[in-house]
């Protein structure tokens, strides 16, 4: 039975795990690392890179390197958070045909789901390489505070990557699964998850294999990226103060600054001070300029203090919704790379009144939890029950633009809820059902998930028709809505697809594109491998020909030289099949050369053995003489 993999598709890094017996195992990628940068790059040569190779070339290709794209997933182009992000990243964020935020590279537009699919493909390949079999099913994690549009877009990304997404699971819940799988005693825990782009806090009750989420809260635009940006802004300001040069519009310099900021942030988690050194960051008429700035941990903490404090309010809200006080939490589990920052650990300790638990790897625990959930769905992991919640209230717009909730936030999912509404005007023959998600009292202030019309209502005075609206949330947190006229029995049902979102046709096209790209990538890899093999054979044959060319006939020597020339010509092109054929031809004609080398080696060995015997016998004589001499000495003594 094929394995179900667990993927933590993070803003900054991604991780993949699989159940190995009773334990979840994190799988190393081709570069030997347990996490993979969530970065995709398109080079000038139209080559696509994923993970570490993409990150390595970011400085020289800022506009073609896409990072932190998860922050755009499921968002509209006119979203204030997208507007903010546009000024902070070197690549182009553009308006998609459906009104969503997309990205553009080399004149081609991509949806965030497509870019995320490329990252998922890399994780899929990592798992397949380890397992030695094709992987088709996965559990993918998302921030707990993701809305329906963001969850749907993540599921779309999985489909584009060629994966059947068995379950979308919340990141803090996945972390709790990995943390509590082997714990039998009942506990109330809080999972504080501060990653690269998002922040979540969830309160859970765990014990005897039951993981029940009591509440969740968070901020989908707060994470390590914001800490990096804050540090980059400081470095730009300091450099301007020193040199009078503003680096704000220099994309190459900004990319170098971003890398340096990320490195400095990591170093300051274990040391009190670091130095940011970037030679030749820019130049003016007086010559090249270098950036060298010392940064203390205290200074960095003061720069990001408001970001750290922004995590406190969601913690308060989560406790309030769970009906608990901070002192009633037995354990606080830290998840996400940013929780290594000492200041964050201090704030968590101060708020919850206890040392946070650091026994899990914050970068890997979410993927491990996803793998465990995969094991549960496959039947490999027994006696585990996961009860998650919907993070935001769901409802519809009613008379006067009011948001009428049908399902309150932190309701356990899956769930179903119906409510009966009526018409607002006499003889109204149709109603528009507008579905929203959020916590504000007016519908317009919340997130519009989608809308549909129920038509064919018989003429009647206002307030008479009975229209039943039903909300159904599945275990992935994805919403289905139906409206039914009780009088006529007419019904309209939709799976909520955000007013933007990807249509089935869009997804189908992107799946085909992804498959075509995978085929092109495979051909490119085959071509590179064929070239490497061919070049290696040319080099070794030329070397052997120089050494043993006089041992073969003139005709054989010419045939080998001609085959080398033909292969060199083929190497100038990109035709992998032709290169393979010419490599094979050279291998065959150079067999005579190999035979001559073998015979020469045998002859040398034979001569060596004969000489060795003579040397050995003369050596024996010497030893005997020595022995006799020593003997004589002994006798004379």
Curated annotation (Swiss-Prot):
Positions of region (Disordered): 516-542, 601-637
Keyword Protein biosynthesis part of the UniProt annotation: no
Low complexity bias: start-end ranges: 601-617
SUPFAM superfamilies on file: Actin-like ATPase domain, Heat shock protein 70kD (HSP70), C-terminal subdomain, Heat shock protein 70kD (HSP70), peptide-binding domain
Gene Ontology MF term list: ATP binding; ATP-dependent protein folding chaperone; unfolded protein binding
Domain of life, source organism: Bacteria
Induction details: By stress conditions e.g. heat shock.
Keywords of this entry: ATP-binding, Chaperone, Nucleotide-binding, Phosphoprotein, Stress response
Modified residues (Phosphothreonine): 198
A Pfam family per the record: HSP70
Biased composition (Basic and acidic residues): 516-529
Family stated for the protein in its record: Belongs to the heat shock protein 70 family.
Function: Acts as a chaperone.
Name of the molecule in the record: Chaperone protein DnaK
């Amino acid at each position: 039975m094929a394995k179900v993999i667990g993927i933590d598709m993070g803003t900054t890094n991604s991780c993949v795990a699989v159940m190995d017996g009773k334990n979840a195992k994190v799988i190393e990628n081709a570069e030997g690392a347990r996490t993979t940068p969530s970065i995709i790059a398109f080079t000038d040569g139209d080559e696509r890179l994923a993970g570490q190779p993409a990150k390595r070339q970011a400085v020289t290709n800022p506009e073609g390197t896409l990072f932190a794209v998860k922050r755009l997933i499921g968002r509209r182009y006119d979203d204030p958070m997208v507007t903010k992000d546009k000024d902070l990243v070197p690549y182009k964020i553009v308006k998609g045909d459906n009104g969503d935020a997309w990205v553009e590279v080399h004149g081609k537009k991509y949806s965030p789901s497509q870019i995320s699919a490329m990252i998922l493909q890399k994780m899929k390949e990592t798992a397949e390489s380890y397992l030695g079999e094709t992987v088709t099913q996965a559990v993918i994690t998302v921030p707990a505070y993701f809305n329906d549009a963001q969850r749907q877009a993540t599921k779309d990304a999985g489909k584009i990557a060629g994966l059947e997404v068995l379950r979308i699971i919340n990141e803090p819940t996945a972390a709790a699964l990995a943390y509590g799988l082997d714990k039998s005693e009942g506990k109330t825990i809080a999972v504080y998850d501060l990653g690269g782009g998002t922040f979540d806090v969830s309160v859970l009750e765990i014990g005897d294999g039951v993981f029940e989420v009591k509440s969740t809260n968070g901020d989908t635009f707060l994470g390590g990226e914001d800490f990096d940006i804050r540090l980059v802004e400081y470095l730009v300001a300091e450099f301007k103060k020193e040199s009078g040069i503003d680096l704000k519009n220099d994309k190459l310099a900004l990319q170098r600054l971003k890398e340096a900021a990320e490195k400095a942030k990591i170093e300051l988690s274990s040391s009190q001070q670091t130095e940011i050194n970037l030679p030749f960051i820019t130049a003016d008429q007086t010559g090249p300029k270098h950036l060298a700035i010392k940064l203390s941990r205290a200074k960095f903490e003061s720069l990001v203090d408001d970001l750290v404090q922004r995590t406190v309010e969601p913690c308060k809200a989560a406790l309030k919704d769970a009906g608990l006080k901070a002192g009633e939490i037995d354990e606080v589990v830290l998840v996400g790379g940013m929780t290594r920052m000492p200041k964050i650990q201090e704030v968590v300790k101060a708020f919850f009144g206890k040392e946070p638990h650091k026994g899990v790897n914050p970068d890997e625990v979410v993927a491990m939890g996803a793998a465990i959930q995969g094991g549960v769905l496959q039947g490999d992991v027994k006696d585990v029950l996961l009860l998650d919640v919907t993070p935001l209230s769901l409802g519809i717009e009613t008379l006067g633009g009011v948001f009428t909730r049908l399902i309150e936030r932190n309701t356990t999912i899956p769930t179903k809820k119906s409510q009966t509404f009526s018409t607002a005007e006499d003889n109204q023959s149709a109603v528009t059902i507008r579905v929203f998600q959020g916590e504000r009292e007016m519908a317009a202030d919340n997130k519009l998930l989608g809308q549909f019309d129920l038509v064919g209502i018989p003429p009647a005075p206002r307030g008479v028709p009975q229209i039943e609206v039903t909300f159904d949330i599945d275990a992935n947190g994805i919403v289905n809505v139906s409206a039914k006229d009780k009088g006529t029995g007419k019904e309209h049902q939709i799976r909520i697809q955000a007013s933007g979102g990807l249509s089935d046709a869009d997804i189908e096209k992107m799946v085909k594109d992804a498959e075509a790209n995978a085929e092109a990538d495979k051909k490119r890899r085959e071509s590179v491998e064929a070239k490497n093999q061919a070049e290696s054979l040319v080099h070794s044959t030329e070397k052997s020909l120089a050494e043993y060319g006089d041992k073969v006939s003139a005709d054989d020597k010419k045939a080998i030289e001609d085959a080398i020339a033909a292969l060199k010509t083929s190497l100038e092109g990109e035709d992998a099949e032709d290169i393979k054929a010419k490599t094979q031809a050279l291998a065959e004609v150079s067999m005579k050369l190999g035979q001559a080398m073998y015979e020469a080696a045998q002859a040398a060995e034979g001569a060596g053995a004969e000489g060795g015997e003579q040397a050995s016998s003369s050596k024996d004589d010497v030893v005997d003489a020595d022995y006799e001499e020593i003997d004589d000495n002994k006798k004379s003594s």
